[in-house]
């Protein structure tokens, strides 16, 4: 297991912080990763999102590499979208809602075509039922883009 990938995969001591099904943890340094792209989610979620990637992910995006290599880790940070108090037409991040992580490791996750997922609220993984929706959404919608929705923002 490569070092960047090891950061996102649970160890035995961190099992309670690992996502059900996949065993993915929040990577320690994800807030320092490079921005891949911002996004908005309309109602009912009404969120502002930022997708960041580790060095493996960023290199793949910059070179246009598909399939993403093993060791790719993406994190999607989400906040409630609220009007700016200084400029009403603008939206700004409000309360943080979740961080979602996707890890590419073909050997560890053969049942989900090499993808492991984690969804975290307040630093803790959500329940198994919510994790069952991850690959079920990615597989039919973005199979032809290596199961990744996010495109690199210029």
PLM feature spans:
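Sequence context surrounding c-type heme c attachment/ligation sites in exported
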Residues: 16-49, 65-154
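Bacterial N-terminal signal peptides
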Residues: 1-8
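Short, structured beta-strand/loop micro-motifs enriched in basic residues and often containing a Trp
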Residues: 46-59
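Boundary at the C-terminal end of the N-terminal hydrophobic targeting segment
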Residues: 8-14
């Amino acid at each position: 297991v490569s070092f960047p990938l090891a950061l996102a995969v649970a160890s035995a001591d961190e099992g309670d912080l690992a996502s059900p099904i996949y065993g993915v943890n929040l990577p320690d340094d994800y807030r320092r990763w490079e921005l891949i792209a911002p996004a908005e989610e309309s109602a009912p979620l009404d969120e502002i999102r930022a997708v960041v990637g580790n060095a493996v992910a960023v290199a793949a995006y910059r070179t246009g590499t598909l399939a993403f290599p093993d060791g790719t880790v993406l994190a999607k940070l989400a906040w409630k979208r609220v009007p700016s108090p200084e400029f009403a037409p603008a939206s700004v991040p409000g309360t943080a809602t979740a961080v979602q992580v996707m890890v590419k490791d073909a050997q560890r996750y053969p049942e989900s075509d090499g993808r492991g997922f984690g969804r975290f609220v307040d630093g803790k993984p959500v329940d198994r039922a919510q994790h069952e929706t991850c690959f079920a959404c990615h597989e039919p919608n973005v199979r032809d883009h290596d199961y990744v929705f996010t495109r690199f923002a210029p």
